[in-house]
Amino acid sequence: VATTTQEETDRYWNAIVGHGGQESACGWCKDRWGVSWQITPMQLTRAITHPDRAAAKRAFDAMMTMRKIDIAAIEAAVARR
């Protein structure tokens, strides 16, 4: 599921996880019926395909520490030098 804001990301995530679902890594979660979903902010997609490969790696490394994606943390990782 592609999202554009943290609020939208949170809404989808909470709707799935908050109703009998399970959290997993890197934006993945599973609903109560066992269907897996990845809630992916567009900012993450742009960050991990950033033309500055070092910035893209920082974004990827930040994502690997997350369950639900935190857009501000991804953007901070890209901005770090």
List PLM regions with ranges.
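Vicinal oxygen chelate
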Residues: 1-43, 50, 65-68, 78-80
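Short cationic/low-complexity microdomains
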Residues: 47-56
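Acidic/histidine-enriched, glycine/proline-rich intrinsically disordered or flexible terminal extensions
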Residues: 55-81
